[in-house]
Amino acid sequence: CCWQKRKFVKSEFVMTKAKPGLKIAIAGLGVVGSEVARQLINRHGDLAIAVGQSLDIVAVSARDRSVDRAFSLDDIDWYDDAARLATRDDVDIVVEMIGGSEGVALDLARASLSSGKHFVTANKAMIAHHGTELATLAEANNAHLMFEAAVAGGIPAVKTLREGLAGNQINRVAGILNGTCNYILSKMETTGRDFDEVLADAQRLGYAEAEPSFDVDGIDAAHKLALLTAMAFGAELTYEQI
């Protein structure tokens, strides 16, 4: 089964169709996962008004419970094993912020969707490698796969392709897919400096990771391109084919 547009249309979760009082489980409480939790907790009332129903965190899973995350876990169940989040009958939505295309994140995605739980992820690698399988699994179990944050973080690229441009024939997709590469290439072009020197500057400024291969080897951009191609053209294009 390919990444057809219809599968991704159905996979995107429409909040207004969900039952009242949504119970949420979050897997992964790093920088991004913790911020998701803080937003859900600190803006609980505003979000309930905005979406028309309560969004309540009932369970989380992460590596280290002792880390100070600037929000209370007192009324939230903790699991060392993320897979257990998919077994809770009261959980409506599982939010995955673990990362990685295989392993724990993929197992959790499969288990959650198989049990009819809606699945939200920012994991571009997993969607790029396994999007067809997960979208098909979501459809088969009347669940919804949401991955807006996996591409162009603060820009609603998925929603735009799914809804705003649904009546258009898209012939071309272009854009800056990786900020680290864009910074490095721009500096090399304008200053004439070599790659290693500009990369070191990017790392010092926080634009590049200490281990930058995911960005500079094109892996991150390839993952994003696989997702955008699927959404824009309904094509079955895997990461390995790019």
Model-derived features: positions:
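Rossmann-fold NAD(P)-binding glycine/threonine-rich loop
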Residues: 103-115, 124-151, 158-162
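N-terminal glycine-/serine-/threonine-rich beta1-alpha1-beta2 phosphate-ribose binding loop
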Residues: 13-115
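Oxidoreductase and adenylate-handling cofactor-binding alpha/beta cores
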Residues: 157-170, 181-193, 223-237
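Substrate-binding/catalytic subdomain of NAD(P)-dependent oxidoreductase enzymes
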Residues: 197-242
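Catalytic, metal-anchored helix/loop core of enzyme active sites in primary metabolism
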Residues: 171-174, 182-185, 189, 201, ...
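A short hydrophobic/small-residue beta-strand
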Residues: 119-120
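Conserved active-site and cofactor/substrate-binding residues in soluble primary-metabolism enzymes
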Residues: 27, 31, 35, 80, ...
